Amino acid sequence: MGRYAVLVSGPAGSGKSTFCSALIAHAQSLGRNVHLFNLDPAAERFEYQPSIDIKELISLEDVMEEMNLGPNGGLIYCFEYLLDNLDWLDDELGQFNDDYIIIDCPGQIELYTHFPIMSRLVNILSSQYHFRICATYLLESQFIDDKTKYFAGVLSAMSAMINLEVPHINLLSKMDLVEKGEIGSEAKRGRKREMERYLDPDPLLLMDEVNSRTNPKFHSLNQALVQLIDDFSMVSFMPLDSTDEDSVGTILSHIDNAVQYGEDEEPKEPKDMDEGDFTAQ
């Protein structure tokens, strides 16, 4: 077996930690060795105790206090410190061979979209530690009630995909709230066809709303950005309900396919048979 890692990223509040817990529970029910890697130096509560925790190396609270930095600057410092202390990472990862690592990332999307820090870490995990990596990017389903926010979320997902350069799955999270009618009332009324316009971004859906809420001088820019999304067809979403085991199982199967899980497993030796097994009845 190889080494596999799932990078769980997305904005704060998108349900990353909940998804990590659901993914771990489902994978363990399948008999897999799964471990949580907390990559958020500010995280405090976990449903599953992390097997690897960046806070054992450095914490955001300490950095902000000692270096007089704000939250974002402190977070970048923490990641730079991690990359400068790969011996710690080597010791932590060395105890997990042939295992599935779930990496719970911070919610500051600049790490995936604007800075090379996360892409450097992903490259190290892939090239130096030989992990097969699939990145997931969670966008909260409440964004479908505000097409401008949804439009920005699609662009952020695309930026993360381009920067990380690994197999990538975008997830529209908290779909249980859509089913309950708490959010996404317009999509709910339009049934499945309307929802599909959000899962596979429809340029007309984006243009109509965005242009109606922005200064006319930005309309050509909006058109260019929407055309970019449509031309490359890079961004699509899978629905995720972390409370539904079938939904989590479907996502895991797509992750498995992306990292080619189990494809390098050596075939098992056939069971030895006694001569009596071939005796005619």
Swiss-Prot record:
Keyword Cell inner membrane: no
InterPro entries: Gpn, Gpn3, P-loop_NTPase
Disulfide bonds: none
Annotated stretches, region: Disordered: 259-281
UniProt record, GO biological process: mitotic sister chromatid cohesion; protein import into nucleus
UniProt protein name: GPN-loop GTPase 3
GO molecular function, one term: GTP binding
Function comment: Small GTPase required for proper nuclear import of RNA polymerase II and III (RNAPII and RNAPIII). May act at an RNAP assembly step prior to nuclear import.
Keyword terms of this UniProt record: GTP-binding, Hydrolase, Nucleotide-binding
Quaternary structure annotation from Swiss-Prot or TrEMBL: Heterodimers with GPN1 or GPN2. Binds to RNA polymerase II (RNAPII).
Family that this chain belongs to: Belongs to the GPN-loop GTPase family.
Short sequence motif named Gly-Pro-Asn (GPN)-loop, residue ranges: 70-72
Site for Stabilizes the phosphate intermediate, residues: N72
Annotated residues for binding of GTP: G13, S14, G15, K16, S17, T18, S173, K174, M175, D176
UniProt source species: Mycosarcoma maydis
